[in-house]
């Protein structure tokens, strides 16, 4: 069994407070709107969701601490076998730096960085639009 580990890290700067980013990402009902390559469908369950991904159905959930900006993603065939991808939300003035660390074994899926980069751009657009609508109200 290989002990290979491959780490990839991506980030996005969002023109919104860290709390707004945390709230948006931790609400799994928002996942299909921004994670368009990963989430083709979603069914909410206790402590997470069953996501229809390109590879089939899988568990997806989050754990975190809003005040600390810690929001970890958990994904796998079941909740018990889910693996963690740590994400962090750091306030930068009135903006937020959202960083996702992807952890793979020997195999890194093709185009995963491109896909997640596009998804983070979607997340940025949606959070900023929501914050703009909130500020205008």
Task: For every predicted segment, state its role.
Residues 74-137:
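Beta-strand/loop substructures that line and gate deep hydrophobic ligand-binding cavities in soluble
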């Amino acid at each position: 069994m290989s002990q290979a580990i491959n780490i990839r890290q991506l980030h996005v700067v969002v023109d919104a407070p860290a709390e707004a980013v945390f709230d948006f990402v931790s609400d799994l009902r928002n996942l299909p709107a921004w994670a368009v390559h990963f989430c083709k469908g979603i069914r909410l369950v206790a402590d997470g969701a069953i996501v229809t991904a390109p590879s089939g159905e899988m568990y997806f959930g989050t754990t975190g601490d809003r005040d600390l900006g810690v929001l970890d993603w958990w994904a796998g065939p079941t909740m018990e076998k889910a693996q963690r991808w740590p994400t962090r939300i750091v306030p930068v003035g009135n903006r937020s730096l959202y960083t996702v660390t992807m952890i793979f074994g020997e195999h890194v899926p093709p185009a995963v960085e491109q896909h997640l980069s596009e998804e983070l751009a979607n997340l940025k657009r949606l959070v900023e639009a929501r914050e703009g609508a909130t500020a205008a109200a």
